[in-house]
Structure formats: C-alpha cells, structure tokens
Amino acid sequence: MSFTFLNQLPTPDEIKRDYPLSPELKELKKQRDAMISNVITGKDSRFLVIIGPCSADNEDSVCDYVSRLTKIQEDVKDQLIIIPRVYTNKPRTTGEGYKGIASQPDPEKAPDMVEGLIAMRKMHIRAIEESGLTCADEMLYPENWGYVEDLLSYVAIGARSVEDQQHRLTVSGFDVASGMKNPTSGDFSVMLNSVYAAQHPHHFVYRGSEVQTTGNPLTHVVLRGAVSKHGNTTQNYHYEDLIRLHDMYAKMDVVNPAAIIDTNHSNSGKKFKEQIRIAREVMHNRQLSSDIRGLVKGLMIESYIEEGNQSIGNHIYGKSITDPCLGWEDSKRLIYDIAELNAK
C-alpha cells in the first residue's frame, strides 16, 4: 500500500537531445501537420486513413509495415492522407497484460520505463526516416507528450481516458489533430464535452509546472462503438448514428466538427475482418448524405503484416500480440478501395 520510487526518468529535453529529429524531417512533419489540419478544417477534401498495428510491439516489424505504406500513399495521394498507427502505449481493461513498448520495451521482460521512453522515440523517428510518413499514437499518459511532441501528426485519446480532466486539459495544449474517442458506455455527450474542453484554453498543473494553454481547434471525435451494461457490444458507425452526431455537434460551441470512425474495437466486436465491411459502409454513407460527408473525415483501421494475433513468445514476425488485425494484403486492397470510394 505504498510507492517505491525506482528510477528518475530523463526529461523530454534530455531524450530529444540524445535522439534528435533532423531539420529535413522537422520540415516534413510541418507539411504533414498542415495537410491533416486542412482535412479536419474542411479546406482539403482528401480523406484520412489512420492504419497500423493494435500495438507497436517490435521496432523492426512496425517500421517494415509503415514503410510498405509509402508506395500506397504515393498512389492515392490525390484522395487519401495515410497516417500510420504507431501505438506505443496499450490501455488494459483490468490493468494486467502488455502495456506497450513505452512501458515494456521487450514484452518478455520486466517493465523498464527509462528504456521504454527511448524505445518509443527511436521507433517513431525510424518510422518517419524510412517511410516519409509522420505517425499517430495514443496519449495514454499525458505526461509523455513532451517526449514525442515533435514527432506525431495525430494523437488519440482512448475510451477509458476521455472523461479524465488531465487528458482533456493536456490536449488543449497540443498543436496537432487530436481524436477523442467515445467512452466505453458510448455516451456521445461525454465525448463531445471532451472536445469542448480540449478546444478551449485552460490553466493547470502539468509536469510540475503551472501552465496555460490556448485550446486545440483540431480536436474532434472518434467513434469506436460501445459496451452495454450487460456486456454486449453496440455499433455507432451507422447512418443514423452519424446523423445524430452531426445534429449534436451543431448545438455545441465548438469549431471544425469532425469525426473519425474506428472500424475495430466495439464497432466490429473485435471481429477484425469486419473492418473491411464497416469501412465500405461508412464510405457509402458519405455518398448518401452531404452532412455525413462533411462530418466524417477519416477511418481508423487495425492492420499489420500478418492477420490475426498471437500469444507473446510465439515470435511470428509482423503479427499482433494484442488485438487481432487485418493482414497486409487485405489492408492494401482496402486502402485502394477507400481511395476509389472517396473519389465518387
């Protein structure tokens, strides 16, 4: 019933000094951030595809996967902006299990937060260097932002974190597109209140300092489905869900109303192959309604080199050790399909 203080963590400035981003890649990130911002604000009609492994567990296979997206991005550049998922923190429903490379650089060894912060930054830098694509990550721990704020072009706040005040206030200081997921209950009001909070300025304590933020106008919602009080999954990507969200957004004092649809989690019931059908349904609904087309700015898809998932210790290259993912061939075909549907 007490804390044992194990190690003093390096500061963000120390980690960034030891693992810097080159001037060329800083410029690349600036350009990518601007493109993504223009999609969220409605200045660019391209569509966002945030795609990658459930959790970024292995630097080699994750960077291999991300590099494969480079050619596809070139092929679909007129229709899509691909944002690789490099999720270095894994929220756990019960608190048990693999919590991501930022906590546990080697899934088969004990946690090591110091090495984890280094592994997190190194993986993101390598992914950008090898692919030319800046990535997305989930900000499970708000205090980690400083270690990657110069690397990420998209941030997600998860279903279990979205009601937390510190997460909301911290996002108000981010300068990149940030998606607030609906809570596991599915309550749209909670999700929209988190967007309102993050879009407005705040005065609070962050990493031992008193800080002030200006608000993040690029904060938006992510629909990931829900779990009922009886433990059943319910979906929230259907036509009527999106119209309801559009109408609720209209009553909020927020700017840039936008939504990303998470095709996995409770929307698919974790039946990973359903992501293909769900993605196509969302794109079809965008064709049916100008309101939905204006609202839905992208899809979030869980995908890796090998489909499905595996137990830790099986060592199948490019296969998820957490939630099951689409395999590469299905993912590639789906991205091209999304590009074609966005053009209609």
Protein language model annotation of sequence segments:
Residues L25-N38, I72-I83, N89, M120:
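N-terminal beta-rich core of secreted/periplasmic extracellular enzymes
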Residues I40-K43, T70-K77, I125-E130, T213, ...:
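Acidic (Asp/Glu)-rich catalytic clusters
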Residues G52, I261, G327:
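Conserved, mostly hydrophobic/aromatic
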Residues C54-D57, N256, N264-K270:
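Short acidic, Gly/Ser-rich segments with clustered Asp/Glu that frequently serve as metal-coordination loops
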